[in-house]
């Protein structure tokens, strides 16, 4: 297995699937958003303990969007809502696709499946 396919971390999603973060996807995330480089733990925590989980519009590939609020993101000039996009390829496993901060307004564009009360 190549270095880029090496698993960096594995976390459990709300549904119980083991979601992996590979070196390739981690490089993708920090290349697109270098300010997230110090927030790997928060990205993983978003999958493990989300505030909300969304599904994309029907025409988009099957993936989930976990959202969690981290006020400390504001300390580096980012929106405090962190979204982690991931895919569950079976009931037991999946992988992280990407992660990004968003505003409250933008997150309403996708369909909420679950919300912490």
Label each region the model flagged.
Residues 1-117:
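Ribonuclease/tRNase effector modules and their secretory precursors
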């Amino acid at each position: 297995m190549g270095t880029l396919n090496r698993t960096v971390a594995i976390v459990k999603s709300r549904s119980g699937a083991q979601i992996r973060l590979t070196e390739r996807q981690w490089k993708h995330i920090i290349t697109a958003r270098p300010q997230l480089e110090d927030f790997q733990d928060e990205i993983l925590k978003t999958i493990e303990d989300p505030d909300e989980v969304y599904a994309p519009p029907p025409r988009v590939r099957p993936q989930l969007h976990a959202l969690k609020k981290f006020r400390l993101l504001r300390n580096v000039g980012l929106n405090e809502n962190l979204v982690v996009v991931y895919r569950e390829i079976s009931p037991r496993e999946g992988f992280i696709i990407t992660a990004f901060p968003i505003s409250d307004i933008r997150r309403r564009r996708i369909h909420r499946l679950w919300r912490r009360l």
